[in-house]
Amino acid sequence: MQEKKTLYLLDAYGLIYRSYHAFARAPLINDSGANVSAVYGFFRSLHTLLCHYRPRYFVAVFDSLTPTFRHVQYPAYKAKRDKTSAELYAQIPLIEEILCALGITVLRHDGFEADDLIATLAKRVAAEHCHVVIISSDKDVLQLVCDTVQVLRLDIDHKWTCCDAAYVQQRWTVMPTQLLDLFSLMGDSSDNVPGVRGIGPKTAAHLLHCFGTLDGIYRHTYSLKEALRTKIVCGKKDAFFSRSLIELRDDVPCVFSLEDSCCIPLDVTSAARIFVREGLHALAQQYRACVQEIDTEATNDTLQMTESSVLTSGRCANECFLSQVEGRASTPEVNSVLKSELKTSAVSGAIPIENRDLRQDVMLARSAGHYRGVTDPVELKRIIDCACANGVVAFDCETDGLHPHDTRLVGFSICFQEAEAFYVPLIVPDVSLHTESTQCTCARSTNVETEKECTEQHGVSASAVQDPAYVQAVMHQLRRLWNDETLTLVMHNGKFDYHVMHRAGVFEHCACNIFDTMVAAWLLDPDRGTYGMDVLAASFFQIRTITFEEVVAKGQTFAHVPYECAVRYAAEDADITFRLYHYLKLRLETAGLLSVFETIEMPLLPILARMEEVGIFLRKDVVQQLTRSFSDLIQQYEHDIFSLAGHEFNIGSPKQLQTVLFQELHLPPGKKNTQGYSTDHSVLKKLARKHPIAEKILLFRDLSKLRSTYTESLAKLADQTGRVHTSFVQIGTATGRLSSRNPNLQNIPIKSTEGRKIRQAFQATVGHELISADYTQIELVVLAHLSQDRNLLNAFRQHIDIHALTAAYIFNVSIDDVQPAMRRIAKTINFGIVYGMSAFRLSDELKISQKEAQSFIYRYFETYPGVYAFSTQVAEQTRKTGYVTSLAGRRRYIRTIDSRNTLERARAERMALNTQIQSSAADIVKIAMIAIQRAFARRPLRAQLLLQVHDELIFEAPAAETAIVKEILFAEMEHAVELSIPLRIHVESGNSWGDFH
């Protein structure tokens, strides 16, 4: 399939203006005394574009030299802008001259702005089924964004940001097609466009969410509140007049051919002469290097490049880089090391991009890094010296496996300056033996005992250890990094690196400060869903990174990767991680989330790593016996189901189950899916009221799941010491709660007999006890604190049974007359409010009518009016800001809070309430975990935190320490944060987890 063509349209004047003012305080003056700030800045930015995005079709679009139709229509258009500097104007002809010399098409049309010409060209090429990338920081061009048109903006930190429909929705909270009407309502003070007086972006967006268009708003003015209606009605003329000014013309009568805009090959020789003439020698050198790099990479279609081609492209990149390294190195030592290193066998980080769907990859560039391997211990020491002096170092380790508990270290990479990174292998290559096939030939040690010793002492891969002294030297430098209290070590998925380094004996207690970019990205957008480095690099920097699958063949490990490929891959990881650090830290600061990150999430990371390493002891014989007893029960349920159906069938087959339930037994079918009528859990629960077979099927399914998920698999997951090591996922939920996987120990049922039996298998080792500390109704306590409802606060202060009290209120009886069934209903409602339960869900939960469920909710809010007021306040505040905030300041964006769909909006409001409560509770538990760990370290104690199951913490301690551990738990957990009412915990100790509660 032929690749779709992509036309790049540059708003030239916007970039010129930005470039000129970037040097306003220190203008660049050439030998002739002329100001060349705009020329230099413009072509530096253009160089980045050309090198990163490799455009084939490119047009630089300029504004009209004469007044435009907008000035004729509205003489005050842009009248408030400062007069453009004569020095800036003088540079525009020179910029056009150089563009033409390069072979880049330059377009302008009298009477029209560049944006109109861009809109016209975008429309024309879209009709030819081409893609368009608009390079502009003008918000007006965002109204052109669609499936085939994207906008590339240069941010204040000089990073290119891809603006697609998702970006527009996030930034302006409307669709691109609604931007014209949004801007018409808002107006634009910089262009002197009036808009509607008193209408800002939030109000304008809200109106468009409700009524769709500007015309729709004016058709429904009767439904607006009086004050808003007055503004809208009075501003009608200005609104539509503003729209006529802001709307981009797509009918500019210009002559244009896509093929005429082809800029390949660039005539750098002609352009370089002009650069030299104007005293811009560095630009001449950069453009020559850029073309050489393009020519070199064009011959290298795959990642497996020959050594000679790698070194050629590396030298080209270095020639460009070395002229500027003086001004970018953080210290003289860094400068010295980098200059000497980059003059040798540097490796270019450029990787070819396959022809893929342009809607996804049109903005993706190659990482322009300068990467090299380091195998000399003396050289490594110098680099680590510079890294430590820098204060911030990105780190990434490479291993021969993906599981942190049984993998070996192959090498590591570091970066302490953007686009420059180093890879240090533990498998030492003999570079002189590399061939054109890039197969790595390593000198292997013949001393088996030495290899075994290195593996046991350092956890490093011994498959190709050349010299134990080298390994010792590398490990010494690793210890320097991880044990430097003044150093910030930046990692992506740092818990994995922490495990590997700890197992390798690099540290006992990590002293450096950890910054995990994966956790930072999650904290900024906890609903994003995916936080892989490759995805973030593409999203934030429009860089396509080398993927693991590209360098590691199926069935092999990183230890088999050829040296040059290993350098490129590993060093790029460190480089991207370093870039992510600066980008994400700034965003954390801007969003007010840096405190949550630094005081909660990062101190928690080593605690979680330690919990995973320790694990919890499992009695294999107990779970094996449970597997047998569960199998007997499952067989009995199966027999009962067959008896009720009248014949045998495959209970696991939805199709056969549909036939039995709805055709043979004539039970009422529920919701329909693509496979017929649903037989899911909710449907079977309803059918259980009508026929016993549904209840038996539910029991059969539940027990089968417990057997396969837990009793059969747990014994296999236990290590040689009998301990099971779950993984705690720090970024697994949008509310900040921790999740558990492989195995998921948080989902073992606590109420069922079978679930309790499974927990019984988790036991303390000889001479130790398990200790459980569980927060008492923490989410209701948080709700009482946040809502300040008097009835709730008084109940907790007086230690009244909150569920009995709620039952007394909603059933209008005294608390002494509350029956167990009443309390059960009240408990469901209490927690249902916290979890955002609708009347429909409550009716299903309590097996009552929806009308009755709704009446219970009404009576609940009558009982606790403060809760109702609080829930309304949360919804309104979330509607204003777009996000909800926890007690500690954690954020979650509720993107459907302004939905025009009533059900969706109500769901979003419940989600906002639930998030604020659940996130705050999660904050409290995390703060308590950190405080407890610090208290243990101060003693010091041998007690260890093993598990976190939402509001419950499980510890293992020597029996002699049980009493003091309980004291610490009460002190730290009940005072983790100060609320209006005290936090309470329930503490138990025993031999097994199943003994508790």
Swiss-Prot record:
It catalyses: DNA(n) + a 2'-deoxyribonucleoside 5'-triphosphate = DNA(n+1) + diphosphate. Pfam families: 5_3_exonuc, 5_3_exonuc_N, DNA_pol_A, DNA_pol_A_exo1. GO terms for biological process: DNA-templated DNA replication; double-strand break repair. Residues 174-261 form the 5'-3' exonuclease domain. Its EC number is 2.7.7.7. The keyword DNA-binding applies. Keywords: DNA damage, DNA repair, DNA replication, DNA-binding, DNA-directed DNA polymerase, Exonuclease, Hydrolase, Nuclease, Nucleotidyltransferase, Transferase. Belongs to the DNA polymerase type-A family. This is DNA polymerase I. The gene is polA.
